[in-house]
Amino acid sequence: MTTADELIKRAGLRSTAPRRAVLDMLLTRPHLTAPELASALPATLSHQGLYNVLDDLRRAGIVRSFEPAGSIARYETRVGDNHHHLVCRDCGKITDVDCAIGMPPCLTPIDDAGFSAIDEAEVTWWGTCTTCTESQKGQR
C-alpha cells in the first residue's frame, strides 16, 4: 500500500506532519468529516490548519470531498474513478459502490443541456446497512 508520504510527494506537495497525519487518517478511515478528523488528530493542528490541509490535498487530487444530502462534506482518498456511495439511514455508515462495468450509464444524461466533456456523476443510494437490519430484527 502506498504511504501518505509517497502520495503527497508524488502529487508535488511538500510532505509535512499535518498533511501526513490527515492523509494517514483518511487512508485508514475514509468518509470522515472535518470535525471527525479534528477530534481524531492531535490538538496541535488548528481547525483552520486542518481545512488548509484538506484543501491542499483536494486540489492536488489526493483527496476528494462529497456531501450526502443532509450532511457536511466528507473526505476520502478514493479518487480517479467514478464510484458512488451507499449511506445507512440509521447509523450513517457509508460504503463505496463501483459504477456499472463498461460504459457507465450514469455518465450519459438523457439531455446534456449543451454541456460537453461530462466526466463525473454523483449518485448516493440510501438504505439500511446489514448491522442495523440485524439489530432491528433482534428488536422485533
Regions found by a protein language model. Give the residues of each.
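Short capping segments at the starts of secondary-structure elements
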Residues: A17, R29-T33
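Basic amphipathic alpha-helical segments that dock to polyanions
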Residues: L50-I62
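Short alpha-helical segments that sit at the start of domains
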Residues: M1-L23
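Non-DNA-binding regulatory cores of transcription-related proteins
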Residues: I62-R140
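Short, locally clustered residues in the helix-turn-helix/winged-helix DNA-binding domain
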Residues: D24-T28
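Short acidic, hydrophobic short linear motifs in intrinsically disordered regions
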Residues: L32-L41
